Amino acid sequence: MNSLLIMGYTSFDLGIFNEKDIKVSIIKKTIRRKLINFLEEGLRWVIFTGNLGFEYWALEVAKELQTDYEFQIGTIFPFETHGQNWNENNQIKLASFKQVDFVKYAFEAYENPGQFRQYNEFLLENTEGSFVFYDEENETKLKNMVEKMKQSSNYEVYLLNFEDLQEIFEEMND
């Protein structure tokens, strides 16, 4: 696989409001393992959409892994205005999404809901697979995108769920 889209729950979805929360370290450990597997299989591009939570933690891990693996990181934001109303702490995280190898904006500004459909289609057409933190028992707005991913032919979907995280947590405590 050449390019991998990373998406998942936001920190708000997960009820995580402190970066020092133990859940963050469990999630990051899981991300690290999975990304290393992808990279050792020849992954060349990791693509983000600029969301807080899972994506941001994956971005941090990916940036750390760039010291040992040769791959590119890209962020394709839906709009140039993405994150403009975020607080100061989150603005720092937004800046981190912009300090990667490739940054593009699908649209200048929001005009209509159809832009999200076009944006999602673009992401699916320009990546070969996805690594998504999503559990079908805990639905969010990611549901439609995950369904589109699964329906796309020749598109690999790797889902991370809460059960996977529980296994990592138990491993850490052994």
From Swiss-Prot:
Domain of life, per lineage: Bacteria
InterPro entries noted in UniProt: YspA
A Pfam match: YpsA
Gene3D superfamilies: 3.40.50.450
NCBIfam families assigned to the protein according to its UniProt record, in alphabetical order: PRK13660.1
Family to which the UniProt record says this protein belongs: Belongs to the UPF0398 family.
Name of this chain's protein: UPF0398 protein LACR_0544
